[in-house]
Amino acid sequence: MYLDRENLFLILFDDINIAYVNGELFQDNVMRDGGALFLGHLLPDDSLKKISSEKGRFRAKQTKFAAGSVFGQVQSTIAAEDDILICDDLGDEWADFIGMNTKGAPPTITFYHAKHGKLTLGAGAFHISVSQAEKNLGRLALPKAAIDTKFYSWEKEPYSNSNKVTAIARVMRGGPRSDIEKHLARLRNSPEVFKRVSIVTSSLSKKA
């Protein structure tokens, strides 16, 4: 049998310390404590308690995302410390938002992935978000040639969705472009910069 011959079976047991992987049975007593370590990376935020959608509805003249949406809370609250904030949603999307705190100690570059869904303790929807974030980790380096191309789309027109062209500027804070490029030139290869990914979701709870 092919699966057996190639040791492709992965078997998990009721005891989370035991797993059968790659044709071998493992016992790792550290696994149970690892859950607490993982939960330490989940940071509750009160601004997400009353969220009703991911992006909200759109009007022709609106200048920011709806307050009741995850996008709206990233723009107004979650990424409030970023003096540069760019909406990169849709198209050649690296993240829903790219934020930079150029004055922090250390300065930070953050990719925000914003998601909404039914409140749950399950990790299914969260896993999808993690997978989407993983594929763009290399782009946290913000390579100059790629950023030059992206600026064209960021500056070309405001954000549009659901057949509505809004007045939401994609470069939300930190412009003009020349100022952002100066910060990028300093931060791009600086050893002190903290590069991170933030999955902002209203669907995951520690105590649902």
Range-by-range predicted roles:
Residues 1-57:
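Long, charge-dense tracts
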Residues 28-46, 50-51, 72-79, 119-133, ...:
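Extended, non-catalytic scaffold segments that flank or surround catalytic motifs
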Residues 47-92:
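Catalytic-core elements of nucleic-acid end-processing and repair enzymes
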Residues 75-138, 151-158, 168-176:
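Catalytic centers of nucleases
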Residues 117-121, 203-208:
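Short acidic, S/G/P-rich loop/turn micro-motifs used as interaction or catalytic elements
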Residues 143-207:
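Metal-dependent nuclease catalytic core centered on acidic motifs
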